[in-house]
């Protein structure tokens, strides 16, 4: 086989997910060397390897068993993400293409070689210090539920807009079908190098989504010096920001990588997922 080492990382709170991991290990342990993430391994009572160390072990791809959130968590652990193959054990999943009944057969095919798609990510900085890298989106929201915040958004030091809203979402093309879409933003083909800026429940009719070049530097500043806000990154981690803080977003030099398993066009795939 072309692939000799694979990683497996999964949700750990659902029996059917853990059983799928067991089935994959049982089927492939004699064919390839398998590294199981520490969290999953602890539940299965086997030896584990942190996802962030799998590249050092020579792992060539990671099989993520769960939903989109599982994929995002695994990617976030890697500075330079390995290719990911998602097994869909959730509900609606844009980042997980393989259904459970097709998992073993699909992995068999992938082990003989695969291609992958690169998707841009966004580095998030707070007062000059890097926090995380987002694959889907960065949301700046009020720290208090049902309270609006006032903030300014700059693109390359040019004022894009000053908004009063529940918040604002900055999404990659990959994330344009997630929170940004629910907030009224456009769906962006991943081949388009862009970042979507989507106000969330803005308090003025002229506030509209923007699509800006991916090489732009985006700056967010709170205008109301009495209110704090929260940055949520891919719905996984959050950080509180204060009125004097400066948030900056830049395109990351390390893309996410997703194993390509079909030639279905992007538009047909989105229609199928949303139908």
Swiss-Prot record:
UniProtKB keywords: ATP-binding, Cytoplasm, Kinase, NAD, NADP, Nucleotide-binding, Transferase
GO MF term set: ATP binding; metal ion binding; NAD+ kinase activity
Annotated EC: 2.7.1.23
Superkingdom, taxonomy of origin: Archaea
Catalytic activity: NAD(+) + ATP = ADP + NADP(+) + H(+)
Pfam families per record: NAD_kinase (PF01513), NAD_kinase_C (PF20143)
Annotated HAMAP family: NAD_kinase
Protein name according to UniProt: NAD kinase
Organism: Methanosarcina acetivorans (strain ATCC 35395 / DSM 2834 / JCM 12185 / C2A)
Annotated gene: nadK
